UniProtKB/Swiss-Prot annotation:
Mg(2+) binds at N8, E380. GO terms for molecular function: acetate kinase activity; ATP binding; magnesium ion binding. Catalyzes the formation of acetyl phosphate from acetate and ATP. Can also catalyze the reverse reaction. The record marks H178, R239 as: Transition state stabilizer. Homodimer. It comes from Listeria innocua serovar 6a (strain ATCC BAA-680 / CLIP 11262). ATP binds at K15, H206, L207, G208, N209, G210, D281, F282, R283, G329, V330, G331, E332, N333. It catalyses: acetate + ATP = acetyl phosphate + ADP. It is found in: Cytoplasm. Mg(2+). Can also accept Mn(2+). This is Acetate kinase 2. One of its GO terms (cellular component) is cytoplasm. One of its GO terms (biological process) is acetate metabolic process.
Amino acid sequence: MHKIMAINAGSSSLKFQIFTMPGEEVLVKGLIERIGLPDAIFNMSFQNEKIKETRAINNHGEAVEILLEQLKTHQVINDLNEITGVGHRVAHGGEAFVSSCIVTDDVVKGIEDVTSLAPLHNPANIIGIKTFRELLPNAVSVAVFDTAFHQTIPEENFLYALPYELYEKHHIRKYGFHGTSHKYVAGKAAEVLKKPLEKLKIISCHLGNGASVCAIEAGKSVNTSMGFTPNAGLMMGTRSGTIDATIIPYLVDELGYSLDEVTHMMSSESGVLGVSGISSDFRDIEIAANEGNSRALLTLRMFTGQICNYIGAYASAMNGCDALLFTAGVGENSPLIRKMVTEQLSYLGVTCNVTKNNAGDMIISNDDEAVKVCIIPTNEELMIARDVEKYTKQTIS
């Protein structure tokens, strides 16, 4: 038995879990928020204890040092060498990384080379990797890429209709994201439905502040809604999703915006927040919609309509759908969103049992339906730990 840590470093946060492997038992989990501010928050829970502290944490390096200190102080671990592997979620691996890999200096450089494709995510991922490599030099560091699962998407689905040399020379193409989540829930759905993953056509809806839909056939991603960057596809909490590309030069040339302002607008001021004018959080939108707010209602119709457009397209492309999955914060916790989506898919044979949906059952379709509609809680940290486990076994052997 050994201990593996899964790390998800955000721009101002650090999410962590330690698993005992191979049993996959969660030893400790937590979240460090508001990194860089004087009132950063350290949360950690283990056994029956919960710790919450507010303190100044200036950067990710400090956050990691404090985390390792706290693990020893509370005797979650006695020696840092007990941690045999650390897995890092990395948002964008470009075409260079088709699977998870052991981190080397060359791997770090490769991640740095594609930072411009995920400017909000990759820099924090890199800081996390460098800090843990320095402080836990004996642990195997593994990079697990959000884009890797989508490397099986065929060329006709990942190419943009731009001059082909832009792909050949500059690798401009659809990459897709949330791959670790889509891969996990597809495998879990096969377990729940008691069917081989290789025999299933699955459409997975990862709906959170970031959102994407993925077509999965025989366990492999064949298409997904996000694109060259995580800004494409569905409207999201603050991201516009896919828009007519010529809107951008129009905003710059005709309305006087700078390119930086447009980029900020599309990533931080658009989507659910931009349309509703209320919030980027669907809980707030649902409350406002229930009170009759017209723009909140419009936001819900737009979001669920876009999801259904992708589901319809992917079901057509795969010539069917055996399972429709809802996961992530909104997908797992919003009966209203699930209801609004499934109501528009009756032509596919999709149903949503009201009682099961409101109760949050794992299978919410009627028992006799061919298309199974499931709520599958995602567990990206466990997928990361499993990938690390493979490499620690190889290293030890």
